Each structure stands twice: as C-alpha cells, then as structure tokens.
Amino acid sequence: MGCVYRRDILGFHRACPSLMVPATSFTNGIPMSPYPATLNIQVPNALDLILSRRSGSAKAMKGPGPNAEQLQRILAAGVRVPDHGKLTPWRFILFEGEGRTRMGAILAEVASGIPDVSADRMQQEAARFLRAPVVIGVVSRLREHIPTPVWEQELSAGAVCMNILMASHAMGFVANWVTEWCAYHPKVLERIGLRPTERIAGFIYIGHPADVLEDRPRPAVEAITTRF
C-alpha cells in the first residue's frame, strides 16, 4: 500500500498507514473506493494553487489532454466533496476521442430541427465537443423523498465541478466549466442517457491553452463581506 503525505507543526513528512478501510457501499448501493485509515494530508502551497486558478475558454484550447491516469486522478479529486447524507448525488459522462464526434452528431441532429438553421450553425454544433481533448459531463442526480434538501444535493454537484477545475489546474491543464444550450435541451439529455431526475451541472472542457492566459479582475472581498 502506498504512503500518504502529512504535514503538521513539525513540517511535511511521509506516513505509511498499515491499514486501509475496505470498500463499502452507501445506502443507495453505490460502491465506495477503499481509503486510508489515517488521512491527514496537507499539500504545500495549496492556497497559492487556489489563488492562481482561472478558467480558459473552450474555444481556445489545444491538446494534449489528460491521459488515462491523469483523468482518473482528476475524477477522484472531483468526488472529494461535501455530500450531506452520503448520497453521491452526481455522476460523470466522459467525452473523449470519437465520443466527442458522436456527441457532435447528436447536437447537429437536434439543431437541425431549428427553423431556418444555417449550415454554419450545423457545423458549429458538430464541432462543439471537439474544442478540447477531453470533456467531462457532471450530472446532478437528485435523490427525492429524503431529508437532504434538493438544494444541498445540487450544491454538492457544483462542488464536484469546482474540484475538477482545481485538479486540472494542479496538473498543468486549463479547464472551462460551461453548460450552453445542450445542457438544457430534453432531446440531447435523453440521447446521452439522463433520467428525469438528472440534470447537467456542467460540461467541463480540459486541455492546454492555445494562447497565454491573462487574469481578470476579481471582486474585492471587502465589498462583498459583512459581519453579523
């Protein structure tokens, strides 16, 4: 079993716990991954990483994207979020390789039903998911008739999206969290396998920036903070 890295007042050091908590299932039947019995990990400069994160436009991305191992780690980071009731109210749809082309065909087909749709629009839709090497669809799947409010379940899905952005940034990629029209069109959602209780929290495009990214102004914290 691999070691975990820990940091305390004495500094950053490595610890190799002798036990792993075995995989279990939550009450909704979703299998859980094994996890260390000892988990107290702090990453040096994590705050600097957060403070340097910014989005890059899906329209200005290039390859390469994350490989299989990197993508697995990005998804693993995605699920490290608050989840009231341990419901796992989210799941992933991966669009890679030819899968992006198939998604484009679906979008073009649905768009063809728009009155007087132009050929340029059809080409745009066919190429929409080709803008980045990898696209992760984050699906919010609501658990109904339970104590956990719907709003909290939706917030958890949003936290998944944010973790994916941060993990991508940590690996040197750029990511863009969008929805666009295809996240709300019932025909598109049906074609990609969403159920009536599911919604797209975001399509996250991941790649490398085609141009140098420049930061943008951020809100002054003092202007949006009150003390009660």
Task: Describe each PLM feature range.
Residues 215-228:
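Phosphate/diphosphate-binding glycine-rich loops and adjacent basic-rich segments that engage nucleotide
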Residues 78, 136, 142-190:
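Small-aliphatic-rich amphipathic alpha-helix that forms the alpha element of a beta-alpha
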Residues 49, 135-139, 203-205, 225:
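Conserved hydrophobic/aromatic beta-strand scaffold that supports enzyme active sites
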Residues 192-216:
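A glycine-rich helix N-cap at a beta->alpha junction
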Residues 26-131, 228:
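N-terminal amphipathic, basic helical "cap/leader" segment at the start of enzyme domains
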Residues 10-12, 19:
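Leucine-biased recognition of intrinsically disordered, low-complexity hydrophobic segments
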